[in-house]
């Protein structure tokens, strides 16, 4: 395996650990007279140290399990319920592609959106039917992940990986003449995939992706703000008579502006509360629809708080200009405009 034996990922500086694991494969699982389709993933022992699994029962796969080719397996909660109901599955044997595995652990379902750790059943790498995965090759059915000690160490780790790749003494098969690759964060992987730059591994597209997202969010917020300004201006113009009377009795521009801004913020608060309830309801309904396996969409109150704060800010902005403009009208002009 190129990553493990030639690049020696586990010796990279300032990392907590490195793991190599297979892509997931859909296979038949047999248990007594039951047969179900499951996603299987082969892992090493470090896989369970890098990804944050919570064990409901039993233990994870270990380095010894991989070294000794122990036929043991970890299953998810849904697979346990399908096969065992409320019974304890630890110690029971299941069959995958003709191979018997003893269940040693149970974990909560991993959402399919978490592509790297996701599976229904996890077994040791070394239990593969053939040892072809140990042979040298450029392409394979495996992934690698590295856990940095600190976020600040990521650039150093990437640099060391790139330097090792350049010094690589590896027989690159024809027609290729060199090996090319990079270590990427989830954001960088998503950015390159979204921007259709899958073959461009010489640079990162994360910053470009961030800028595009920020521009999109800005436009998404700006357009409703412009609409709100127009709506507020029309609404306030309808109250020209009221404004004219209040100005005639000595109401200052500041008092009128504050009044209309407060009214606008209150309306925004009501809209935000309605949006909160609607969003929560949609999430509950979406969680009951079996579109994404094992999804568990939860309401993120921190994101909602920031979104709500931005909404209030733009609510204030959309109320300032109309309120300031109408409050500057002469009382007589305001009364005439209201009478028209």
Regions found by a protein language model. Name each.
Residues 211, 255, 299-307:
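Residue-level signature of transmembrane alpha-helical entry/exit and packing/kink sites
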